[in-house]
UniProtKB/Swiss-Prot annotation:
HAMAP family: Ribosomal_uL2_B (MF_01320_B). This is Large ribosomal subunit protein uL2cz/uL2cy. Residues 1-26, 223-273 are annotated as: Disordered. Keywords: Chloroplast, Plastid, Ribonucleoprotein, Ribosomal protein. The keyword Hydrolase does not apply. It is found in: Plastid, Chloroplast. GO terms for biological process: mitochondrial translation. The keyword Transferase does not apply. Part of the 50S ribosomal subunit. It comes from Ceratophyllum demersum (Rigid hornwort).
Amino acid sequence: MAIHLYKTSTPSTRNGSVDSKVKSNPRNNLIYGQHHCGKGRNARGIITAGHRGGGHKRLYRKIDFRRNEKDISGRIVTIEYDPNRNAYICLIHYGDGEKRYILHPRGAIIGDTVVSGTEVPISMGNALPLTDMPLGTAIHNVEITLGRGGQLARAAGAVAKLIAKEGKSATLRLPSGEVRLISKNCSATVGQVGNVGVNQKRLGRAGSKCWLGKRPVVRGVVMNPVDHPHGGGEGRAPIGRKKPATPWGYPALGRRSRKRKKYSDSLILRRRK
């Protein structure tokens, strides 16, 4: 990713940076509108995900996570910005005339060829089942359920690693550090997701974050008691509790949020860090 630093002409541009090369020019048959009305609320209008709302209008890009164009080579025509994710996307023109978007693999350039199938080369951007990959292969867009499409390691810079194969299962090390079992028949894409330096981009001002649909963050200790367990008191008061809590009174900072007795507990060999 080519990051362009602004000249220091104003306080906001002094600390700002933008991506200077990747643009967005989506195809009409691969996009559709989506209605944003929740703004972090549930069906009753109660905030369940904080600091969300507003933002620029978006058109959703149809991403091919299944990669079911088997044994048909495709050429990367464009590399585009997607407002719905922090990774870039590639427009692929397949030999049979099909056109689809896929996640941009790191290092892929316009003109490269990608293909999916069972007996394809182990090269960047190709999709194939885990059973046909050698151990130590770096992969992304990994399926959990056969035929459902990739669900793991899809964010910018994400990469998983195939570390073992035994019986009907393959062992993967995920970006979170979790080690789990997945069926060897599930497919994945070779390589790492692009836009690795997304965390190096500085927005520079509050307005840029508003365009992304992110609202300001307010500390609970400066709120009223009716709004947060940390609120209230005279002046700068401590939280008044032994341990910090969420706005709903649950323990914060380290409390495990995964549901107990999930079906996939037996597939996780080592929980995430």
